[in-house]
Amino acid sequence: MLRPSEQWNWIYCSTKDRLLLDISDEAQFCSPFTSSQLACKPTQQPLSMAEAQAFWQIDDSLQQLEMPAAVRLELCLTALCAHYLQQQAHKSWYFQQGADCSAKPFELVMLRGLSGQYALVLSSETDCVTCLLLGDISTLSGKQLKRLQVIRVLRNRISPLKLDIPFRHTA
């Protein structure tokens, strides 16, 4: 797994119309976010210490789910991009009422429409949370929301994640 570095830089690429993270001369992460979704378009914005710390918190949360390291890395880097996204209206009507949980940033939660899906809380307000969808989900209206989409919902639409944690993770 890659380790965050002060050498990493956020940039907006107009050719690709994407937010990118320059990792090295040979590696670059291309986010799924276009200019219309961004609040600002960075040029050589170094990765901050807070972002590096968030990277490790996100990775730690995602380790609760069984997934390959490459997928976990993609989710970590995509979640870090949320800092550059525009604020959005909530999409609570797409989801069933949940348990009104008090999830904090970087915790995993469950959203339920016609299907259920894991989501990573990116930011938290008194009555809303902004989440990154970890997989596709079918909403109550039948609309498909795609993996890696960032959505904002009322807290009463999320439920805490309940996983059976293997004994090796509890010692």
Feature-to-residue mapping (PLM):
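Mixed-charge, low-complexity intrinsically disordered regions
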Residues: 1-105, 110-116, 138-143, 147, ...
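Surface loops and adjacent helix of pleckstrin homology
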Residues: 24, 134, 156
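Short beta-strand-centered aromatic/proline hotspots
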Residues: 116-132, 136
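Structured surface patches comprising rigid loops and adjacent beta-strands/short helices at the edges
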Residues: 148-163
